[in-house]
């Protein structure tokens, strides 16, 4: 035996060889000349094992190469390994070999290794081998069935890819030696092949022939040439193996299959000829090499094992000779293929109608698309080469994005070939994370590419609006981009221009990669290329020395003009991840040269402290930003990146099913506000319009028109549908209606059409459980599978629709039901992938359209729909769900008259803005016309992440109720109703978001409640017809007490709801409460005058109820106190800044309810749910003075709620905060008076991310924080005392205590006694306070983002004149220690959607920034730049009591707290403020401002009521004129209480004491005018 063989076998650890088997190789006959070629070996190649079986063949499908990625470092080390098993081996057409798979997924490649199952006997086949062999030898059929018909050579004694465990050096040596033998024995064959390959590539390379008109075929053509070049290079380098030829053949067959499947062009014949030529060129060398490498001994043992297995499996009968004849094919039917073809033909469509249809469809699909097929809607964005427009296909009504590239630009820049590359890549790519193209065509001046429209804008705009992204959001976006990149790289595509601008966000919140204008097409991935030398070659694939891309994202090797390849994309990915997490790129400079210098030489700067990145993220970015492309993560393939620890818990296969944190909310189907048009930088609209370029343009441009298979599919399906349903002309928006058609054969098609295109729906289609619904869902699912871009309408799964009992009427509080889209005529976008998730609306009796038509100042066409005249929804309304998502910005603006509001008699449909949460509901007949539990939660929504749902503008956090009882009327006997209710938390699935519900905890035996039929354990849904879910406990108690001696309670059995009882939440401290919006009816305002004084006291309670005694005065009338400890407000963690304070109704609207203060919570605060009380960041503490306490304007206006900014809260009750500046108004009393406004459109605010959600890393916020640190020193030495909780605290002491907790300060407790600020001796500016509705929760008090020493810009005259005739307003100025004046916008509040001309609006926007999550900030910030701000709203203004008399404005007090300063004169007739001890307390009640007298004395009844302006005020008040409510004494106001705003409603006139009002002899004469 030769020494070399012994050396090779010495490492082979196989103890149980049968005797003599080790020496079998040496006894085999070999010629002497072959031995001399390979040293002293007895084999034609290097030593090889006696059997393939020790080789690494997967024992299960999981081990098979198709599921294995060779890039795993663990399985693909370049370290030396044992060489005993010199031959790698696998069967030729082994089903699990990885070749039958899609080549691009051949990242997943062979895992054949020589190092596993060494314990097996040499000739013992594995289960997989036996299965394959029995199939191969046991039947006359080819083995190709499992591989989709792909055929491979009959026997392949070698594996098809590199053994992962083998060292490349020894492997390459083996290949080189084999090639040496091969060339020596067959010199002519090798030379012939190389020469033919050279001629082939030269003759057919894309530069030598006209580009193919079909994008798919053009891409395949390019790949064929690349494969031929690669084969030529490998042959010259002596690296060719049989395995390589096998893979080359497989890839060519795969490309050919793609060509046939995905192209309808006649050019397929050209591609077929190319493939055939290339296969013929390589066929002879491949055969010779296979013969040279053939090992008969291996084959013999293989055959033995197969025969044995076949006999055991009864595949071989006893008649062996007949079996052999059959195996040789001598008994085969000569015409099986013909028969098979006939069968196929007969299996097709035999009916003439179907034949005609298919013919028509194919002819339709062949019709070339052109510019006339599309209507341009608007510009989406501009770029360097052209512009992108939103267009709609005229026939299918489907929306697309059309990229128009100016031909002259391309010709002048010599970029025509690049346009074809982009077209080919977009057409060929079929991946959920890559934008798909539908067709391309040329016009006289442009090349046009029609792509899917991705609605959510790009990541660059998102970053610009919100700064750094939360880690989870960045991880998901990055991971989806990795998958897109992996797909492209497998097809040899290098993007070269990766940046956030090219990552688009779909309507479901996922990522799509776009813009391949700079991309290069290289060689598709080959598993045989996974060795060290090729990785280096791959990294230097392109040697064009082009420096192209966006400077901040260009890799060092491109800057240095070295060769580059796929690693340049991984460098850009590192920059992108850094930008996602930090908010800016790591390298920047004033010039590209300076920037490139940093890229090549500088280190990365990492944020530190609170803003430090997670360790895994930092490691990942560092690995991606390696200057050397060979060591850069991803150079060996995307698998290196995917297995990084940063993605440890990520499910790579379920990314698309993952709930996105940010889901775009579109105003309409044509909303492009998420995009930056960049019109300031680029302008392509009329460029080159004067020139006629058609004469001189290159001939290849005429080949640009193509139609992708996906467009053909969509177009033909829409045409087919349109044949079944006649079109009606498009009527005026809002007036056309589609009558319910009779049930017939077409209904099935119509149902499908509705699912695909979002056409208007017949009302009966939405009856629960009807076949139409099921059909709709099915068509949705098929559309989702078949299309790269699912329609918006198809994105919702109507999982909650099929149970009619779960549909109940919603509450009136959902303003969204007011807004209606017109029904689309049947010619409306069938293919409109904008398709609305169709939502039916019903409008009950008594609902007038007058209120609707005045809901907006300028209703958009199509926004309003004529109401149904009857209570049942006979007039169907298919409502655009995109409108509903943002409906709160388009409804009931501030000047809608209360009396014009529709009554509650008709149920309306609640829409959820959540993408997967709630869908359409059919209102049930409800005695109250509304139900709090009307939103059926689909199981998906219950388990979904609340973060994206929180960004929805309107949501009903209520479990589904299968049936409501009729209301139970309870007559009070004495002081008791005889039942106890309790508030419970109901969590949304697995999330930390909960809503508050109320159950009957106990019913007294023999009490009124029991007699009325109330049962313990029932869920209370309504009290007196008003839904109570989402109300906090005190609100429900108030609601019950307001009803006097009789209360109507509607309940439902607990088991009939979808609420399930589970274990206590461990992380309950992180919980966030979802609050609902309430809107009282107009009747309440009039009846409230007759309420008892008890309710007036409740009304006067201060803002934040102290839980332990919030209702202590009511214990005797209702046994509610015992339910408080169990209520959701009880037991908040000590670190919560609002521990033991409970927001009452209004804080729900301001999002200030006390919940999680956990800084770890990154769930965005929803406008509809209440924001958590975030701990105020320490760097932002010390702003002086604190934001003033919120007030609530009328609930009827609060459809849109802005959560209170986290900056407005103090970190803890024990921390000191500075006293307010001198120019403070009486009414403000140190606390924010914020007035949530009904937003007409998204408020134009740009907000930083709350620090509690993620450490803010945006540069803007850093600057803001550093500026605000100036205020910290001021607050450090100010006195701050612990808040006292006992009732015995005296009023003055109580006020003093509160100066340390201004955000929790009560208005009534500090009626104007502002303590002087010591050390601030500047002259005190007199402040005036504008009366009327105070809209903005943001613009009151000192601006939190304004530094101590900065002064506000002056208020413009336009701003002083409110549209409703409000009084002129002068912001008070306060002087800081530095001598600079700080102008504080205390009185001049504005509705947020009003565009102001001075700087105050910007400051208010800055404040608001912290109130929302980054996701919601993007919602609001984008609208200011898109120019789509809503119509300005007119604030409600209180009219004076008598003509000529102006309102008294409460004034701030100076150092002398016992006297009032002179008010700043507003007009000649403005009366002077009361002197002496008379003080006015400002209170907002039901949209009116009430000025009531001193706390101890009731007001004089000399107020003459006078109504407000008709369009602004409720109906005339008929209450007695003495309705000014005295402020209750301090003993009745708990330390944390506040007025229960909304329980009583006063006349407008009581808000304005007339001139000359006499109180205890103190007259208020009018001061002289200014």
Curated annotation (Swiss-Prot):
Expressed in fetal brain. Its main location: membrane. GO terms for biological process: brain development; cytoskeleton organization; intracellular signal transduction; protein phosphorylation. Residues 967-1055 form the PDZ domain. It is a peripheral membrane protein. One of its GO terms (cellular component) is neuronal cell body. ATP binds at residues 380-388, 403. The modification Phosphoserine is found at residues 90, 139, 167, 346, 687, 893, 952, 1413. It comes from the Eukaryota. Residues 374-647 form the Protein kinase domain. It is found in: Cell membrane; Cytoplasm, Cytoskeleton; Cell projection, Axon; Cell projection, Dendrite. InterPro entries: AGC-kinase_C (IPR000961), Kinase-like_dom_sf (IPR011009), MAST (IPR037711), MAST_pre-PK_dom (IPR015022), MAST_pre-PK_dom_sf (IPR023142), PDZ (IPR001478), PDZ_6 (IPR041489), PDZ_sf (IPR036034). Residues 29-45, 66-80, 94-104, 1137-1146, 1226-1235 have a biased composition (Polar residues). Keywords: ATP-binding, Cell membrane, Cell projection, Cytoplasm, Cytoskeleton, Disease variant, Intellectual disability, Kinase, Magnesium, Membrane, Metal-binding, Nucleotide-binding, Phosphoprotein, Serine/threonine-protein kinase, Transferase. It catalyses: L-seryl-[protein] + ATP = O-phospho-L-seryl-[protein] + ADP + H(+); L-threonyl-[protein] + ATP = O-phospho-L-threonyl-[protein] + ADP + H(+). The active site is at residue 497. Residues 648-719 form the AGC-kinase C-terminal domain. Microtubule-associated protein essential for correct brain development. Appears to link the dystrophin/utrophin network with microtubule filaments via the syntrophins. Phosphorylation of DMD or UTRN may modulate their affinities for associated proteins. Belongs to the protein kinase superfamily. AGC Ser/Thr protein kinase family. This is Microtubule-associated serine/threonine-protein kinase 1. It comes from Homo sapiens (Human). The lineage of its organism: Eukaryota, Metazoa, Chordata, Craniata, Vertebrata. The gene is MAST1.
